[in-house]
């Protein structure tokens, strides 16, 4: 096997060209086998095997800098840079990340995880290179999907004035060369992607400039060339911005890719190389359903079926069913996603109500203001979005939604710890940034049924900005007997005793139950409260608890700073209530990838860690009482 020769960086450069295609096939088999066991991003990685190999063959890494937009397609890059043996621990706690990480390898030039950032980061590296008078290539690889994000165009606009080399590889995995551009552009691509073309171009220009009126002749030729390209060539938009364009190029032809990369190095300025790849290439199940294999858990290689541990509905499933049910009755309900209809559960809505479904692409900022506009026009927009991606639209929430009191519902999926995708995807900041905004209401359900009730409340019984945050994974079906009607700003008493009160937000109620069970065995009196509303905090409930309890324990799966616990402390401080409060929350840090149970333990928000903290604080409360006697 040729793959056995690839054990350290640059081993690929020792291969002969006749070995390239076999290595690509072996890498695909390796990825399918490994990801079938660990889970991960499969379809996108199968699509860029040859592209990645060509980049490593054409450039001198790590001196040359390679940036992967989003970064989920960097698995082949990791294989070629000496990390092949780490794939058994892919995305596991303490194991290899599923994204580029500078602290994992110096071949990873820039950390990524969210979309549309690579051109900005690459341009920054170019400027650093030039100001330090250094000499290396900078290559940003960005997918066609990421080009739906406005940040990419902001960076392209900035890059258009560059006078030094910057290479942008556009990985287009949704189009076919023949279907979209035909034979003439393909022929012109072959011509434009050759050294002889650029030699001729430079020689003709230099000769003409020496002639009387040469400047005028060159300008005329450029205008004629531009008009011709406008009619028959793709990429005209980029060239209108002042960015050179090469392609389209077959992204599965390694030698042709290498040739184009060498041409691109010669261009003084920013250059786009349009590469066409096939998502899921080489594995029939991923080719047929690339969306399913974009991010997938362990699966059966033969059938392509995911090995799910349970068929119970997820929170996303619960949301999907309820919004469709409500939309049947209320035609003003519309749904918005930022390129995540599958993940957020809006696929069913898109089929049932296609005229009321809007996928705006990877454009969270636009999605929020677009939703605000629909709300201003009398509709009831629901923006379904992952917690970590909503961060990108903070200003739009504040400026375009909340200042105007517009009725936009934010359905925030993947709130809290999400696990294997790591720092960039943990949903642990939404409570902090949302509760800082005036006019925003924030709720968190204790189980799947309460999520349904909250969505109905938000759409039918409310008329201002409101967010519902819920976790990834299977919807909790316990505590169904506690189903008091939802009233604005009011918490729900679950179990009322005395001494110690556990006030839990959302899915932390499950942990609160486990903590109470253990503490009851030790003889403690424990109250459990379902916060329901993170903002506003139920101050009546807090007053009630302070009358019969000595210790209030807040519990949330969010960072402490700016979260639910701090709001509770602030209320007691404002009312001069000196009751002891213990905040259980995530630390002021980023949380790496790994199993959620492990991450909770490491972060101190699991059952045993909380019990230890509660007992220590309770001992302090009793000691304080003794000192005051």
Spans of model-derived segments:
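Glycine-/acidic-rich phosphate or pyrophosphate-binding loops and their flanking alpha/beta elements
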Residues: 259-262, 294-295, 304, 314-329, ...
């Amino acid at each position: 096997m040729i793959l056995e020769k690839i054990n350290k960086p640059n081993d690929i450069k020792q291969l002969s060209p006749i070995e390239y295609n076999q290595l690509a096939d072996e890498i695909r088999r390796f990825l399918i086998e490994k990801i079938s066991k660990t889970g991960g991003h499969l379809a996108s990685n199968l699509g860029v095997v040859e592209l990645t190999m060509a980049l490593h063959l054409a450039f001198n890494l790590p001196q040359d800098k390679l940036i992967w937009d989003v970064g989920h397609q960097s698995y082949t890059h990791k294989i070629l840079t000496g990390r092949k043996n780490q794939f058994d621990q892919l995305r596991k706690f303490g194991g290899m990340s599923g994204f580029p990480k500078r602290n994992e390898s110096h071949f990873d030039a820039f950390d990524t995880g969210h979309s549309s950032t690579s051109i900005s980061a690459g341009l920054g590296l170019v400027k650093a290179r030039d100001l330090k008078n250094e000499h290396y290539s900078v290559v940003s690889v960005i997918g066609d999907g990421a080009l739906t994000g406005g940040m990419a165009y902001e960076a392209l606009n900035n890059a258009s004035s560059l006078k030094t080399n910057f290479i942008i590889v556009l990985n287009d995995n949704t189009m076919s060369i023949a279907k979209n551009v035909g034979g003439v552009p393909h022929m012109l691509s072959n011509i434009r992607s050759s050294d002889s073309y650029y030699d001729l171009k430079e020689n003709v220009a230099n000769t003409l400039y020496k002639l009387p009126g040469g400047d005028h002749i060159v300008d005329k030729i450029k205008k004629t060339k531009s008009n011709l390209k406008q009619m028959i060539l793709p990429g005209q938009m980029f060239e209108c911005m002042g960015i050179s364009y090469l392609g389209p190029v077959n992204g599965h032809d390694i030698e042709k890719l290498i040739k184009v990369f060498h041409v691109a190095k010669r261009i003084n300025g920013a250059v786009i190389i349009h590469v066409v790849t096939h998502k899921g290439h080489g594995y029939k199940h991923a080719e047929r359903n690339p969306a399913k294999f974009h991010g997938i858990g362990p699966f059966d290689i033969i059938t392509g079926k995911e090995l799910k541990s349970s068929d119970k509905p997820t929170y996303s499933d619960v949301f999907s069913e309820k919004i469709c049910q409500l939309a049947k009755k209320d035609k003003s309900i519309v749904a918005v996603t930022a390129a995540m209809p599958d993940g957020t559960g809006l696929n069913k809505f898109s089929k049932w109500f296609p005229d009321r479904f809007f996928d705006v692409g990877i454009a969270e900022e636009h999605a929020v203001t677009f939703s605000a506009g629909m709300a201003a026009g009398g509709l009831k927009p629901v923006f379904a979005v992952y917690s970590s991606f909503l961060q990108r639209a903070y200003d739009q929430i504040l400026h375009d939604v909340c200042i105007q009191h517009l009725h936009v519902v934010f359905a925030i999926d993947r709130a809290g710890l999400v696990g294997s995708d790591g720092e960039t995807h943990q949903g642990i900041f939404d409570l902090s940034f949302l509760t800082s905004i005036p006019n925003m209401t924030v709720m968190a359900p204790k189980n799947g049924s309460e999520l349904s009730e909250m969505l109905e409340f938000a759409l039918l019984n409310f008329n201002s900005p409101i967010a519902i945050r819920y976790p990834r994974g299977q919807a909790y079906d316990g505590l169904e007997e506690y189903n008091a009607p939802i009233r604005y700003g009011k918490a729900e008493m679950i179990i009322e005793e005395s001494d110690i009160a556990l006030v839990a937000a959302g899915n932390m109620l499950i942990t609160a139950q486990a903590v109470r069970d253990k503490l009851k065995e030790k003889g403690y009196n424990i109250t459990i409260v379902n916060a329901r509303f993170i903002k506003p905090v139920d101050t009546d409930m807090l007053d009630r608890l302070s009358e019969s309890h000595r210790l209030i324990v807040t519990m949330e799966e969010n960072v402490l700073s700016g979260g639910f616990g701090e709001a509770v402390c602030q209320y007691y401080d404002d009312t001069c209530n000196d009751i002891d409060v213990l905040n259980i929350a995530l630390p002021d840090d980023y949380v790496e990838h790994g199993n959620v149970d492990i991450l909770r333990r490491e972060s101190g928000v699991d059952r045993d860690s909380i019990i230890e903290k509660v007992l220590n604080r309770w001992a302090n409360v009793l000691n304080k009482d003794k000192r005051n006697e």
